[in-house]
Amino acid sequence: MLTPTRVNKIIDIVAKDYPQIKNKPIKVTIQKGKEAWTCATSNSDYELLISKVYDLEIGNNSRFAEMFLPYMDDTFKLDLTWFLADFQSALDAVVLIHELGHVIQTSEINFKKGNNWMNYARKMNAAYEDYREECFENNYNYLERAIAYRQIPYEYESDRIASEMFNKYAVRLISIISGKTQKELKTIREEKMYELQEA
């Protein structure tokens, strides 16, 4: 379960590889019953809007997870074995770091220089508009739309960062979110992997 304190611990871990994530303060807001997790930015700070858990019972979240995890495995070799230790906490970690990936991508833009920010915003808006046009013109179903969305450069880069950080720090991330010890999680993972091999 995510709390502002736990999120800030995860930000500290990510900052070891991406120190620019600390360029501006990140305000963490825990929202209730929301499907979308977002990261908004201003001249002075970021606001991360997340939920206590990435709730698979809300909206399209369950369908999204069914697409997202195989996609992340195929595209970035996300280590899915850690999902055996604690599925919910592992999913929360990956989706959270995806949002932090958006912070990392914008962290070095000088917002006080309008041209820098406007150029970035124009490119980003054009990429999302291309995605919407592609979906409309091809009459994509949910799965096709979801896959196309992941190919938007800003989403793709955040997915890459999420996979990289999760694969490197999985047991620590899951431990922070779940409250279980790293030893417990490693044991659960090993037992589940053994069960799968024996099945």
Predicted feature residues:
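Active-site scaffold of zinc-dependent metalloenzymes
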Residues: 38-90, 100-107
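Substrate-binding/catalytic groove segments of enzymes
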Residues: 104-117, 164-176
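Charge-rich, solvent-exposed alpha-helical interaction surfaces
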Residues: 9-13, 99, 123, 127, ...
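Zn2+-dependent metallopeptidase catalytic core
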Residues: 4-22
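Post-HEXXH active-site segment of zinc metalloproteases
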Residues: 90-91, 106-146
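Amphipathic, interaction-prone secondary-structure segments
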Residues: 21, 26-44
